[in-house]
């Protein structure tokens, strides 16, 4: 292991074949209020984090969604960065309703819920709203946030493809809870060209290895959410800690570096509200691992048996008629 840049970690990914993006991006979800609801408590800090990411660290890929806030996250990005640098790629998502704070925690007693909504009319409305909030004429990457089991996927993606033809979307992607399957991706490609997917994936949860291999072979960006796991992966008792200490880096940096080496299709979006942690995460791009070290890190995590936070695919989806 060394801490110099290498082609494996520094070469940009060509999103859609024409948008070069640095593979260590930024996930803006946490720049909202408590429970990802409303504006951030410290707007000045949120602006500082975004500006430092883009102007100081050279991050040129930012991930957001209309459901973060809802809407506040997109507006914060515009407030901090508009007019945007020419090379900045903003990915936003639509097609998910939220009922309140902390509604991603499905097993919390009495918790609010998330609700996929793939109705074409709703998606068109949400694209128009995202364009307005972000202050752009065309969204570089727009992802269907969650697949609606009550609406044919071809109908949802078909409407987004029409918006793409109208010049309002440049590239299309697909996300789901907890992730897009190979079968869903193949089905989606019959309707629209999908250049990115966003799935749960990290060194402790590699259940979607098959999806990652498919994405890599087909030059599709694989954007892993929860790249640092759900706490246990990077905590003081993590299996990564002794390995990271040996090389004078943090467990977070090691976990991110592992992903950068796992596949050239992985496009990372670690999120933070701290400039200090932002710098720490960005430094992971300079950590070089050889193939033996990549295998050893995965083996160490497997032996530790770290628990994964992985909801059963589509198990928590409620029908659209429950929304009020």
What do these predicted regions represent?
Residues 40-53, 116-133, 180-185:
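Short, acidic/polar
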Residues 97, 101-108:
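Short, flexible, mixed-charge acidic loops at enzyme active sites
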Residues 1-92, 323-324:
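N-terminal binding-site loop/beta-alpha segment at the start of enzyme catalytic domains
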